[in-house]
Amino acid sequence: MGRYWLLPGLLLSLPLVTGWSTSNCLVTEGSRLPLVSRYFTFCRHSKLSFLAACLSVSNLTQTLEVVPRTVEGLCLGGTVSTLLPDAFSAFPGLKVLALSLHLTQLLPGALRGLGQLQSLSFFDSPLRRSLFLPPDAFSDLISLQRLHISGPCLDKKAGIRLPPGLQWLGVTLSCIQDVGELAGMFPDLVQGSSSRVSWTLQKLDLSSNWKLKMASPGSLQGLQVEILDLTRTPLDAVWLKGLGLQKLDVLYAQTATAELAAEAVAHFELQGLIVKESKIGSISQEALASCHSLKTLGLSSTGLTKLPPGFLTAMPRLQRLELSGNQLQSAVLCMNETGDVSGLTTLDLSGNRLRILPPAAFSCLPHLRELLLRYNQLLSLEGYLFQELQQLETLKLDGNPLLHLGKNWLAALPALTTLSLLDTQIRMSPEPGFWGAKNLHTLSLKLPALPAPAVLFLPMYLTSLELHIASGTTEHWTLSPAIFPSLETLTISGGGLKLKLGSQNASGVFPALQKLSLLKNSLDAFCSQGTSNLFLWQLPKLQSLRVWGAGNSSRPCLITGLPSLRELKLASLQSITQPRSVQLEELVGDLPQLQALVLSSTGLKSLSAAAFQRLHSLQVLVLEYEKDLMLQDSLREYSPQMPHYIYILESNLACHCANAWMEPWVKRSTKTYIYIRDNRLCPGQDRLSARGSLPSFLWDHCPQTLELKLFLASSALVFMLIALPLLQEARNSWIPYLQALFRVWLQGLRGKGDKGKRFLFDVFVSHCRQDQGWVIEELLPALEGFLPAGLGLRLCLPERDFEPGKDVVDNVVDSMLSSRTTLCVLSGQALCNPRCRLELRLATSLLLAAPSPPVLLLVFLEPISRHQLPGYHRLARLLRRGDYCLWPEEEERKSGFWTWLRSRLG
């Protein structure tokens, strides 16, 4: 599998998508779809504003997370067996959805939320698996007009309800054997199965169903179909009569017999019949008599050797006739003795064996507008052949020898606008009447190889010109006239052409030229031969330039000086015999209006910011079949001026540390969308680790990534140093606290917390070293002294009664559990002492959680805000307000304190 990187930053005018790091999705605007159309095989809808294609999908939810929510077209390919409910509910504006996911079932509600969807397609390998669709699968698709299911087999009794606005239904490459099975799959099609009187489809496509051989009588009763496509199926058209179709206008079919589908034509009064790639051979008069309703008849590649007499007379309404790819040796369409006139407007006789056209070949076709005679064996043409074709607009004679053309051979065609003479051996005449009427605007012509310079006489007011150069042509051609004021499109195919423009430059000869295509051309004839090697044709109105090299360019030609150029395509400019690497700035110069740039097999090796500084309007950059690309780090600083879309397709980035900066940069990019499809493995990597191999290679081998590793290591060290005080705090407080709680819980399980037990101490006194003086001088005499001055209680003081050598936590726990009452002496210093905090926290926890909690008394030696106490202690104060007291400074109030303490200690 290839490697895909998807890195965001879409156009600011589009909803910005963030968080994309890697994906196998490609997004584009509809206007730019032709640049990347190969990745949108199933949804080539350039009228949509925004499209996305995702390949190798295995986790649909994860894949769709990176797709912009505003896409109108979505193509998905991969392996996802089940479509879950609300699978596309995040895309309410979706209009076209194509799924090639090897689906086996759609769960109810899978297409919920797609109220604007107009076209839905399911694709799979033919006859491989079944697709389960619930009856209400399309109930939410209120705008659906087109439904295509190609490949999977449907249940014959699925009972799927169709959206009311559906106009186009296709079930192709499936297991269907009988047309009547459609009634079980889609019962709405049959009259009486729903509230509709009858269903009308613009097109029903059943093509390429290799098992389709039957049509059960009455199975589609009442259905109205404008176009029915049965091409590449074994079903004979004669079966269609009994289907019960209320209407059928056009039929695409193949016939298993050597007969025209005349019965179907007569039964439905068809307006169109297209029978291709069938062995008809000849047409009988009986079959011809049934075709009087036809307006279109297509009989391409049907093995016809001749046409029956009265062929056109039998079809008075016929407007379009296609007879290409047959074995006709003569075109006897018009019978002079009858004088009948046909309404035919289009006639295609291409690919036959016509050598000579009779004088009256087209005499009955005064309404003919398009005549196609390509790839026959015509040797000569005379003007009288076209005398009756006063309305003819298009004449195509490509692929005929045409060794002789009569004088003024096109003079009889005043309406002719398009003429194609490619792949002919025509000898052009300088006489003014050679090209016929002045309305000729589009001309395609092959120039013969000449031993000496020659003048190329052309119509002056052409708008489109295509010139193919014969191999071996090396001499100059001088154009006549010297100016073509209306020419907008020029295509030159083949190398060796040298146009002599006289004293004028190209802009003077072609002042209106907007589109220029140079095919199979090395550009040597269009570039200066000095050190600069600049493109010579300075055309101020040129908007599109396409160059397809012949693989023999000696050096790059700099395309510059075209102020209106919007689209530039350069392909196959790399020399096959002497390949060399080039920089983008050697190919593209100052093009201020350029919006789309496509480079394919040009030898490009690196991209730098310098190349983009003269391309201020560039929006799309496509790189195809370029090897070992390096992206210079100067692009990092130039990021705000980068194109909105960069596609690196079927190309590979060099496994070089110069590219190490790129991955983190593109992940942070906020304006440029970059899609990289790279199939290459770096040295030392196997096929199993191909995905993401370049990033892993750069991570392991490049000093830039070593610096990153050192940065991460130092960051981890700093983090650890910051965390040490926290760990120390946990060691001094929370860990002992948890240990103590565990011991209390464990002793409770062992029965040591029973109410009847005898206590070793009456009071456990918790205090800090700073408060020890108050405990000894004030508290100890009052509690341990004998009556009447004291209470005669036994106190547990940590400094005096803790067992030497025993763990502090164990001493605290044992002493608390061995005391009837816990007395915490609190002050500012005590709250900062770790042991006092532990004792207070433990005592509070026992008060709140123990099944037989001890008495907890709090003595505050100084005023302390409750916000200074931990949460547990604040809660304890709120629960038992009588268990705490403040030590008074005034002597007269101390007796009240001792009275409170004696009452609490009983």
Swiss-Prot record:
Subcellular location: Membrane
Extent of the signal sequence: 1-21
UniProt xrefs under SUPFAM superfamilies: L domain-like, Toll/Interleukin receptor TIR domain
Main location as per UniProt: membrane
Tissue: Macrophages, liver, kidney and bladder epithelial cells.
GO terms assigned for molecular function: NAD+ nucleosidase activity, cyclic ADP-ribose generating
Protein name: Toll-like receptor 12
Lineage: Eukaryota, Metazoa, Chordata, Craniata, Vertebrata
